[in-house]
Design a protein with these regions (language model features):
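Broad, structure-driven detector of short, well-ordered beta-strand segments within folded domains
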Residues: 15-21, 134-138, 209-215
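Extended, loop-rich substrate-binding clefts of extracytoplasmic carbohydrate-active enzymes
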Residues: 76-148, 231-232
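Short strand-coil-strand connectors
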Residues: 11-13, 33, 128-132, 205
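Polysaccharide-binding surfaces and accessory modules of carbohydrate-active proteins
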Residues: 143-146, 150-220
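Residue-level detector of beta-strand face positions
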Residues: 7-9, 124-126, 150, 201
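Active-site pocket scaffolds in enzymes
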Residues: 50, 221-232
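Catalytic core of carbohydrate-active enzymes
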Residues: 18-90
Length: 232
């Protein structure tokens, strides 16, 4: 994307994962070849050249005769407020980590990459964290992407991992969450909160497949829809 940041490509016959080699050590791309889909497609909100059109007032009609040019017509499908187009302070990627201290403050690990050797199936990153250290390992194993964390000598707090996922379906029956017991609590367009869970499936009928999120130990899961503003 010509942002000047080096990228590390991990790949096999099923999956390609692209990691930004910056302090976040997060994925900017996750390609599933069998589904022909990138789960890490660009979701970071940036300033776009067409946002100035949001200041225009949609007109119900025109006094002039003839058909208005499509380039001059401004109409909004949904109500858009300034906060909807505010640039993101941090990039929206997969496996973006944060550390919530007991005093309520938030710290973000500043990862540094270890040495890499071909063939690239795994990568290791480390970061100091409140007097201790966190190690992050990203590994490909067939159609599975494994991301492991090990915290050493870190004081009390809460470690959170954010996954910004791009899927064809956002709302409606075609995009829904499936729990371990095969029940469907809601669709991608609704908020979902799970306590002490180890598995959640994102089933997308438009995609023709799904994504299974699993954890080695019980975790709290918060899932929310993400809305963007685009010109079409």
């Amino acid at each position: 994307d010509f942002d000047g940041v080096r990228e590390l490509f991990l790949g096999n016959a099923d999956v390609q994962a692209v990691v930004k080699l910056d302090a976040h050590a997060a994925l900017c791309e996750l390609d599933a070849y069998g589904l022909a889909h990138n789960f890490g497609d660009a979701l970071t909100q940036r300033a776009e050249h067409y946002y100035h059109k949001l200041d225009a007032v949609p007109e119900a009609g025109s006094e002039q005769a003839g058909i208005a040019s499509a380039h001059d017509r401004v109409a909004f499908k949904d109500v858009i407020v300034p906060a909807d187009v505010a640039p993101d302070a941090r990039p929206r990627r997969l496996f973006a980590d944060a550390w919530q201290r007991l005093d309520g403050e938030t710290a973000w690990p500043q990862y540094a990459a270890a040495a890499f050797k071909a063939p690239l199936m795994s990568a290791v990153f480390t970061s100091p964290l409140d007097g201790g250290e966190v190690t992050k390992t990203i590994t490909l194993a067939g159609r599975t992407l494994q991301v492991g964390y090990r915290l050493r000598n870190v004081p009390g707090g809460r470690f959170s991992v954010e996954l910004n996922l791009a899927l064809p379906s956002c709302d409606g029956y075609s995009g829904r969450y499936v729990l371990t017991d095969s029940s469907i609590p809601c669709g991608f367009g609704q908020a979902l909160d799970l306590a002490v869970s180890q598995r959640l499936t994102l089933d997308d009928r438009v995609l023709g497949g799904g994504l299974v999120l699993s954890a080695s130990r019980p975790v709290d899961i918060k899932a929310r829809p993400h809305y963007t503003v685009s010109q079409s």
